[in-house]
Structures are given as structure tokens and as C-alpha cells.
Amino acid sequence: MKALRNYLDKIKPNFEEGGKFHAFRSVFDGFETFLFVPNATSKSGTHIHDSIDSKRIMSMVVIALVPALLFGMYNVGYQHFHATGAAGGFWEMFIYGFLAVLPKIIVSYVVGLGIEFVVAQWKKEEIQEGFLVSGILIPMIVPVDCPLWILAVATAFSVIFAKEVFGGTGMNVFNVALITRAFLFFAYPTKMSGDAVWVSGDSIFGLGQSVDGLTVATPLGAAATSGAVPEFSWDMVTGLIPGSIGETSVIAIALGAILLLWTGIASWKTMFSVFVGLSLIHI
């Protein structure tokens, strides 16, 4: 890390006022503060110096999402192999899911961060770190069959109109990931609901098999259609059920929640209020 620090210090003058790459100062600052804690200090007032800044907080949230993301990748492969009847072991299922989910993560970050870089350059401000979390949340809350171009349009819409128009990270009144989901649901309802969007029916690099017209209902979808609550299954807890990429596993999500509580990033009061509010709605 010392060698990397020395290299950044060496090229930093090129991005400062008068340097040949001054126009890209915001981009450089964004990468530098992502890798290292800024050494800036306040000139007045009483402040507490803490090594945990907003980028570190966002990074910890991303780490907390990893269990649900990894399980979601496996579940994408599991649902495909299970629905198509194709033979495959754990690694075949995981690799299939990884290849199906990775393009969505790339599109989300490229579009969202691209817009934030452009806005930061235009406003001559530092790169804001809020999209570190939104960029991973967006692909986790959409069906695996959501087309990439639709995901790109929805991501661009939410970053611009739900975040940047309000001033950026910390000043937006809406959650970017949830606005993306809402935009997709109302603008492209056939790609976000029904029984044909939860399981991938395509073969990826020779893994799995292509099947036309593959339909699989989620437990809640089946309950809404039949009017009967599905019989309890531990698959609903472990997450081996159809659904959006990162939403199915209670265990994986709970692991992330425990990490956030243990590190002090999240409050149990906030989490508890979600369940209380949901319960009151159904009274």
C-alpha cells in the first residue's frame, strides 16, 4: 500500500490547479479517497477525527450485501437447472448465476458512476460515494430476466431525477435503488412481474439449456393467484425459491444485518421499526 500511496502522491500534481489533467481532478479525488482516508483537517470549530468516513461506511454496507449477492447468484443457477431439468452440480449452478448476474452489476455501476463522474466534473466537486451501495442494490432487486438496456435506462433515470437534481448524496429525498425498482415496475411491468421473469431460460457459455416460454411463480405470486397461502417450506428461509436476485434468502440477509449491527453502521431501532410498521399495515 505504501508503494501505491507514493505513486498517487507522484501523479497528484497533474490533477491539481494548473496541472495537465486538472479537468479530471474530481475523478482522481474519488479514487484516492476510496483507497485512502483523506488527511484533510478542519481549520476551526470542534471536530472529532475519525478514520471512518462516508466511503468506509458505504464500503461496509456493500460487504454486508455480499452474502445475499453470492447466494442470489447460486439461486439463479439453481432455479434455472431445476426448472429446465438440466443436470448440474453446485459450481455449475453458481457459475451460471455469476455469469447471469455480473452483466447487471457492470451496467448498474457503469451507468450510475458514469453519470456521477460527469456531474462532479461539471459542478467541479468531489465524486460522491453514495452510488457504491446503490450500484450493487439495483441489480439485487430486479428479476434475472430484466434486459440490460432497460436496467440502464432505469438506473440513469433514478440517479438523475431521484438524486442529482436534489444535490447529490445526502440531499436526495428518495432512495435511488427503490426509485429504480418503481420506475421499472411502472414503465416496464411485463419485465418486473408475472411468472416469466424470475428464472433465466437461456444457456450461458454452454451452461444450462435454452428453454422458450419458461414460467415459474414466486410463493407470493402463487398465493395471489390461488388465494391460498403456500405450505411452509424451509426453502423460503434458505432462499431456494424464485424471486429477485438478492431478495430470497432470509439467512443471507440476516448475516448482512448482523454485520451492520456489530459494526455500528446500522441501528436495531431502524430495523425493528420496519417490522413494526409492516405488521401495523396488515392489522
Question: Model-derived features: where do they sit?
Answer:
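Alpha-helical transmembrane segments in multi-pass membrane proteins
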Residues: 60-68, 104-116, 131-135, 139, ...
